[in-house]
UniProtKB/Swiss-Prot annotation:
Protein name per the record: Protein Wnt-7
Pfam name, any one: wnt
Single biological process term from Gene Ontology: positive regulation of JNK cascade
Claim: Disulfide bond is one of the keywords in the record: yes
Lipid-modified residues, O-palmitoleoyl serine kind: 1
Similarity-based family: Belongs to the Wnt family.
Residues that span the membrane, as ranges: none
Keywords: Developmental protein, Disulfide bond, Extracellular matrix, Glycoprotein, Lipoprotein, Secreted, Wnt signaling pathway
Keyword Lipoprotein in record: yes
Superkingdom as given in the UniProt entry: Eukaryota
Post-translational modification: Palmitoleoylation is required for efficient binding to frizzled receptors. Depalmitoleoylation leads to Wnt signaling pathway inhibition.
Intracellular or extracellular location(s): Secreted, Extracellular space, Extracellular matrix
InterPro entries in UniProt: Wnt, Wnt_C
Length: 123
């Protein structure tokens, strides 16, 4: 008949929210590993599970880590963290400046300020 049909296939990513949710689940249950060096070379030959008590061989899609992250709530000059003690936070925020997140469960003091200024109002 002279007509033809064309099919085009491509790979698409899942919705961004789904990717974020899956990454968060993996972040909450990571597996600590340590590199084991090969005898003849200095390169790591494989990764060994660090915590044998909770042994669970990580799957290729699991999140693994080599060392624990520093505690940024406390001052630690070794890693360059000044800590969060004494910093201002936003009591009504749900972001990174929120008091719940920034104060690391230590609690916080609230201060109320009143500011008076002339607004050049005309009646």
């Amino acid at each position: 008949s002279g007509s033809c049909t064309t099919k085009t296939c491509w790979t698409t990513l899942p919705p961004f929210r789904l990717v974020g949710n899956i990454l968060k689940q993996k972040y909450e249950k990571p597996v600590q590993v340590e590199p084991v060096r090969a005898r003849r070379t200095r390169r790591p030959a494989f990764l060994k599970i660090k915590d044998i008590k909770n042994f669970k061989k990580p799957r290729p899609t699991d999140m693994v880590y080599l060392q624990r992250s520093p505690n940024y709530c406390d001052r630690d000059p070794r890693v360059g963290s000044l800590g969060t003690v004494g910093r201002q936070c936003n009591r009504t925020s749900i972001g990174t400046d929120s008091c719940d997140l920034m104060c690391c469960g230590r609690g916080y003091n609230t201060h109320q300020y009143t500011r008076i200024w002339q607004c050049n109002c005309k009646f």
